[in-house]
Design a protein with these regions (language model features):
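Primarily extracytoplasmic ectodomains and periplasmic/lumenal surface modules that are beta-strand-rich
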Residues: 52-56, 90-92, 101-103, 279-282
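Membrane-interface motif at the C-terminal end of an N-terminal transmembrane signal
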Residues: 21-40
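N-terminal Sec-pathway targeting helices
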Residues: 2-20
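Short extracytoplasmic
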Residues: 48-70
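Single conserved position on a long alpha-helix in the C-terminal lobe of the eukaryotic protein kinase
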Residues: 47, 74-177, 313-415
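Short amphipathic beta-strand starts and helix->beta connectors
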Residues: 30-33, 73-82, 216-220, 254-259, ...
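Leucine-rich, highly hydrophobic segment in Treponema pallidum outer-membrane-associated proteins
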Residues: 16-23, 165-275, 420-467
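Extended non-catalytic domains of envelope/secretory-pathway proteins
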Residues: 252-253, 259-326, 336-343
Length: 467
């Protein structure tokens, strides 16, 4: 005989089920976030440091918090990864798992006494302090985060950004980029959108991709291998858009490879860059940087720099021998060109120069010129010996006639872009005396003597930092 289920029992059962669902949702919503979940999904760059692996490689655990923020890492759980990231509004963030909240509080109190940070405030279930180094720090028993650098007037914006990250359910750990990042080998793993790197620094990567590709759609994944006398960073350039990937692959084949013909000169020069390029692509890329765009606009008021650079096709190199105190370089830029009559309008240029204040343009030979204004002096022309269009500082005019430091390679695979910096020479330049840039480089490259970057076919790149 079947039992009749009363209406009251049905209502009670449904009520209990609904209560359980609501409780589960509330628990999910209110459950404390993992420290890794503080990183926003739209982060433009993320660096993942695994201290345990790093200690095995180098014998100790570097303290990025000390070198960047000016604080010790007391209370941080070094058994778990540390993260640095770039927020969508382009602040730099650090986040780590907390092992001992009291140790952090003790350290902050000492800094307050030393007037290196402001007294701690508490709200939104977080402790907050403003570090004199320009960082806003927030922490609790689970995580410690710092965001900056900024000035005191930016504290409200930094606070809003941290609060938004804490309260958001949209985090980097739920993205495909995070899964790809974790697959990278090494103790230090990196993800970055190409637009997270400011111009002109991202040009090293952009020289190996089509100029019309949106940098925001291009991703770089990398890992660092730390050896006894060098650090090697291997990276892969890719995109979530398959059309972009196909465009980069096609561009590599069209661009062609180079080989370095004079390694000794590269090692002894402050700065060397070499690649193979087509003029229109090069010109389009140079104009993405405001400083270079302004420089070209200034030159175009007197000469047709756009036409000259647009005519190039083949090897393109740049050498810098010195930087002045204001970072003005002594340089030699050369590019292969087969174009004739590049200077057919030279007489018009010289007449135009006469109408401009403090501008002098002289023709020193059929295909050679000297240009000066109140900011710079420049030799430019075409050398028949090596078919090189050149723009050079007067003191490096002899380099214009010398063979290119790189040559085209007939191999289908190899180097697309080469870049070398002699750090010993860089640190000796007058522009490094004031300390700001020197301190940054000394902090991130302690004891290093040279940096070499190579972009390779297959959307790969490597950075070698020699100690």
């Amino acid at each position: 005989m079947k039992k009749n289920i009363s209406k009251k029992s049905i209502i009670l059962t449904l009520t209990m089920a609904a209560t359980l669902v609501v409780a589960a949702l509330l628990a999910w919503w209110l459950w404390p976030k993992n420290y890794e979940e503080m990183i926003p999904a739209q982060a433009k760059a993320v660096v993942r440091i695994q201290p345990a692996k790093l200690q095995k490689e180098v014998g100790n655990i570097p303290n990025p918090l000390k070198s960047v923020l000016g604080i010790e890492a007391n209370g941080i759980d070094f058994s778990q990864p540390l993260y640095a990231f770039v927020t969508p509004n382009e602040y730099i963030g650090f986040v780590a798992k907390v092992e001992n909240e009291e140790a952090i509080e003790t350290q902050i109190n000492k800094l307050v006494a030393q007037k290196q940070c402001q007294p701690t405030e508490e709200y939104d279930n977080l402790h907050w302090t403003w570090l004199s180094s320009g960082w806003l720090m927030a922490w609790n028993s689970r995580m410690a985060m710092a965001l900056g650098p900024g000035v005191a007037q930016e504290k409200d914006m930094l606070r809003q950004t941290i609060t938004s990250m804490v309260n958001s359910s949209d985090c980097f750990t739920k993205t495909a980029a995070y899964n790809q990042l974790k697959k990278q080998e090494g103790s230090i793993q990196l993800f970055a959108q190409l637009d997270a790197m400011p111009t002109p620094y991202n040009m090293l990567f952009r020289l190996s991709v089509p100029a019309d590709c949106d940098p925001a759609t291009i991703q770089v994944f990398a890992s660092a291998q730390i050896n006894k006398d060098s650090t090697i960073i291997n990276s892969q350039i890719t995109s979530e858009n398959e059309d972009i990937v196909n465009a980069i692959n096609a561009f590599e084949k069209e661009k062609g490879c180079i080989r370095i013909a004079n390694p000794a000169l590269c090692d002894s020069t402050l700065f060397v860059m070499a690649t193979s390029t087509q003029g229109k692509q090069l010109l389009q890329l140079l104009k993405t940087d405001a400083t270079l765009r302004g420089l070209l606009m200034g030159l175009n008021q007197t000469i047709d720099a756009d036409r000259m650079l647009g005519s190039t096709q083949g090897v393109f190199t740049m050498e810098i021998s010195t930087f002045a105190k204001d970072w003005t370089p002594t340089f030699c830029l050369k590019a292969e060109t087969s174009a004739n009559n590049l200077f057919a309008d030279a007489n018009y240029w010289m007449e135009s120069a006469k109408k401009q204040k403090n501008v002098v343009l002289k023709r020193t030979s059929a295909d050679a010129f000297f240009l000066s204004n109140d900011k710079q002096q420049l030799n430019f022309g075409k050398n028949a010996t090596n078919n090189a269009l050149y723009f050079t500082s007067p003191s490096l005019i002899n380099r214009a006639a010398q063979p290119f430091i790189a040559q085209k390679s007939n191999k289908p695979q190899g180097t697309l872009v080469y870049f070398h910096v002699n750090l010993n020479k860089l640190f000796a330049q007058p522009c490094m005396n004031d300390g700001a840039m020197k301190n940054i480089l000394k902090t991130i490259l302690p004891g290093s003597h040279a940096i070499t970057y190579k972009a390779e076919t297959g959307r790969k790149a490597s950075i070698i930092i020699k100690d």
